[in-house]
Amino acid sequence: MHCPAKINYFFRWANYVKGVIANFHNIGPLEVGFDAAIVTSVPLGGGVSSSAALEVAFYTLLESLSNSLASDKKQKALACQKAEHDFAGNPCGIMDQFVSIFGDKGHAVFIDCMKMEAESVPLDDPNCAVLITNSNVKHDLATSAYAER
């Protein structure tokens, strides 16, 4: 892959965007320039897939700018995962990107990583509640044993 973008270690979040741009160019040309401001309410580093949310949102912006909205969702997830591997140095799995792309309101996402398939599962049982909490436990896949698997 040839990309003139340099990895930035001070503004680490920018590396995710650079990686998405680099991987999008592998799929189709982006023939317009643009300015973008990134604003989020997703807590960074809180274990709620903020990096995948950023990657998928930015990829979706590029699809819109290039009029290539018919992108394959699995290919989109893999491109975003590759961005995280190559530009952020984070050897992540595919779960976060799949959930960001295949998720639907009121549904869980069942992911078969062997087949690289996702399925929406309704969460319509009134006796079931989903609780999301911030444990304040920080993890860093780039420096953990995760990459050895």
State the predicted function of each range.
Residues 1-52, 56-73, 78-87, 92, ...:
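ATP-binding N-lobe of GHMP and related small-molecule kinases
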Residues 67-149:
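ATP-dependent small-molecule kinase catalytic core of the GHMP/sugar-kinase superfamily
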